[in-house]
Structure formats: structure tokens, C-alpha cells
């Protein structure tokens, strides 16, 4: 009978492991191992700078010291990009890194010089939905060939307001949900992580968040229209929170810094338990009102897991501020550890696989 018990246990374990891989849940004991990480390394696992190909050298230095979770790559890029990304991964002190890029199509595609032109979301919505999924998969396969692990797409904003335009599939939430999920599935088919953006909906906001903090329609309007597509994103999709002021929800505070928006609405009400990423905290909507390190503290407190923090030369300052916030009580260790746990699980990194000095 002992043997039977053992078999049952090991079967259960196997099953658990399988489902773990699919949902990317952390391995048992992960929380303890994360709590044992050196503080600077731990806070680094929630930070992603934005760099061009030339800036990947600086990123390699940060990665070698265990101070970042990955990087967002922007233009200019050239034929040496794949090698540059591989060299960053090779020196990382904390395992596989997130290598992300905005490859939406239309006006926002960083790799068109290498991979060719891709239609905008608005143009895609005129094509058969199955073809869109295939095209998204093919593009993501080409991205994987360069070393990318994440596509900061699809845009599931409803409407073509300032800063969005043809980046949105449609003014109709059902069309956005259908095509947005087709793109997300295509990206997943290629083994990359899709990132739906910009929660809770930038499509009908008053301004471009690169310049200033836009105001959306009132929350009850958002619920009926803009929140619809988010409910249809496939499991494994991450969510990027935009910089938006929502009357009746955040009232003048950016959603990316709002506990009500991220933890209250996205996590609790909508039940999202995947990875939450901030839009770039260096954008005018946020940076206009405070510095990036302060914004990073608020964004983590709000419930965001992975922070895009602008240029790589600012990473040390952000990390320092997060350490200070942990020490003075503005940030709870539990919240930081939870974010790190999600990011490492997303990267397929076992936090117990390291020996810290």
C-alpha cells in the first residue's frame, strides 16, 4: 500500500508540474527563495529599460549584475540585432531575460527594416480573422528568431483617439475583441508572450499619453465598451496598463499608478492573475508630474509587476528608490516579492536555482 501512495503522489506531482508550465505558476518554495535574494537583485527583477540596439551593451552590463528583468528594444536596429540580444542573454546573472518589442504593425513597428512592413490593426480588421492569426504567428516566429520573447501587442483599445488612430482595430468592442484575441493567439502559437494594451482603454481618451495624462470617458462608459475586449484575451496574455485618468475610478491619478485600477479593477473585479506591465514610466503622462523612481514605487504599490522605466542610465536610480521604499515602508516586501515571482515565472526562471553570496 505504501507503493500505491508513492505512485499517487508522484502522479499528482507530475500533473501539477504540467499545469504549472501552462499557467506559468512559480515552483514550490519560490517565495522563500525570492525572499532570500539580495535586495538590489530582487528589485531589479521588476525593471525593464528601453534601449536601441546600440544601448544593448549597457543593458548587458546591468544584466550581468542582475539588476534588470530584460529590455524593450526600439529603433534603430540592423542585421546585428540577433547577436546583440544573444550576448545580453549570455551574460545575465538571473537567467533568461524578457526581450520585448512593440511590433503592432502600421505606425508602430520597430523591426520593419529587418522583417518587412506589417499592416496596421485597422487594416488587419479588413482581413479574414484566421489569416490575421497566421500572420501574427509568422511575425512572432521571425521575432523569436532574433531572440525576442515578448511582443508589446495587440492594441485592444476601442476607438481611434489621440495617440491611437489606426493602431486600434475598430470603434466596435466586439471587432476589437475578435481581432485582438486572434493576434494574441498567433503570438502565443509562436511561443512568445503577447501583451494586450493599454488597460483600461486608451481608444476614446482625450489626449496622447506620450505628451500628457489623457482623460477617458466616465468609468460606467468604459465598462460597457472599452473593458469588453480584455475579457476575451487568451490565457498567457500579459496586460499593459496605460497612463489614463478615469473619472469615477482614478479621478486624476494615472491608471498605471492606481491601486483601484490595477488591483481593484483588473485583478479583483476582472479576475486577471497574469503578468501586469506598466506602459513606459518615462512618458509625459507620468513624467510630467513626478520623477521615474517615484512613479515606479507607486506603480508597484498599485499592483503592477513589471515596470518599463525609460532609458537604461536611469535604472540604478529606480532600483535605489525601490530599496529605500522597502526600507521606509512605502513598499511592502510581500508586494515586491509577488511581482518578482510573477516576472520570474514568466521568464521560466526558478528562483531557487541560484546561490547568492
Show the residue positions of the predicted features.
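Glycine-rich, aromatic-flanked loop segments that form ligand/cofactor-binding clefts
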Residues: 89-116, 132-157, 176, 180, ...
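Short acidic, glycine-rich surface-loop motifs adjacent to enzyme active sites
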Residues: 61-80, 152, 156-162, 234-252
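N-terminal hydrophobic targeting/anchoring segments and the immediately downstream early-domain regions
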Residues: 24-100, 106-113
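Hydrophobic faces of well-ordered beta-strands that scaffold small-molecule active sites
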Residues: 44-51, 69-73, 97-104, 150-154, ...
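A charged helix-plus-loop insertion that forms the helical arch/lid used to bind
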Residues: 115-128
Amino acid at each position: 500500500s505504501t507503493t500505491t501512495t508513492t505512485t499517487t503522489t508522484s502522479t499528482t506531482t507530475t500533473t501539477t508540474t504540467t499545469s504549472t508550465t501552462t499557467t506559468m505558476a512559480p515552483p514550490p518554495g519560490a517565495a522563500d527563495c525570492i525572499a532570500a535574494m539580495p535586495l538590489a537583485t530582487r528589485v531589479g527583477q521588476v525593471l525593464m529599460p528601453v534601449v536601441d540596439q546600440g544601448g544593448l551593451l549597457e543593458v548587458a552590463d546591468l544584466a550581468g549584475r542582475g539588476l534588470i528583468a530584460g529590455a524593450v528594444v526600439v529603433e534603430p536596429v540592423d542585421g546585428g540585432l540577433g547577436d546583440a540580444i544573444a550576448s545580453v542573454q549570455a551574460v545575465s546573472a538571473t537567467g533568461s531575460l524578457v526581450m520585448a518589442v512593440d511590433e503592432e504593425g502600421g505606425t508602430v513597428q520597430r523591426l520593419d527594416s529587418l522583417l518587412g512592413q506589417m499592416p496596421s490593426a485597422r487594416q488587419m480588421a479588413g482581413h479574414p480573422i484566421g489569416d490575421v492569426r497566421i500572420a501574427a504567428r509568422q511575425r512572432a516566429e521571425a521575432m523569436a528568431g532574433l531572440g525576442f520573447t515578448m511582443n508589446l501587442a495587440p492594441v485592444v483599445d476601442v476607438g481611434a483617439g489621440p495617440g491611437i488612430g489606426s493602431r486600434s482595430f475598430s470603434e466596435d468592442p466586439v471587432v476589437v475583441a475578435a481581432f485582438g484575441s486572434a493576434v494574441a493567439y498567433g503570438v502565443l502559437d509562436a511561443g512568445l508572450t503577447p501583451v494586450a494594451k493599454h488597460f483600461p482603454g486608451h481608444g476614446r481618451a482625450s489626449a496622447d499619453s506620450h505628451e500628457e495624462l489623457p482623460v477617458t470617458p466616465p468609468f460606467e462608459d468604459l465598462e460597457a465598451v472599452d473593458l469588453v475586449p480584455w475579457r476575451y484575451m487568451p490565457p498567457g496574455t500579459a496586460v499593459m496598463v496605460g497612463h489614463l485618468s478615469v473619472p469615477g475610478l482614478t479621478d486624476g491619478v494615472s491608471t498605471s499608478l492606481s491601486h483601484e485600477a490595477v488591483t481593484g479593477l483588473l485583478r479583483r473585479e476582472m479576475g486577471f492573475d497574469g503578468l501586469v506591465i506598466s506602459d513606459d514610466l518615462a512618458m509625459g503622462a507620468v513624467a510630467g508630474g513626478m520623477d521615474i523612481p517615484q512613479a515606479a514605487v507607486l506603480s508597484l504599490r498599485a499592483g503592477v509587476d513589471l515596470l518599463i522605466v525609460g532609458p537604461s542610465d536611469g535604472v540604478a536610480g529606480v532600483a535605489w528608490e525601490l530599496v529605500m521604499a522597502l526600507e521606509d515602508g512605502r513598499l511592502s516586501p510581500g508586494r515586491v516579492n509577488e511581482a518578482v515571482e510573477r516576472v520570474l515565472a514568466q521568464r521560466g526562471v526558478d528562483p531557487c536555482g541560484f546561490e547568492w553570496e
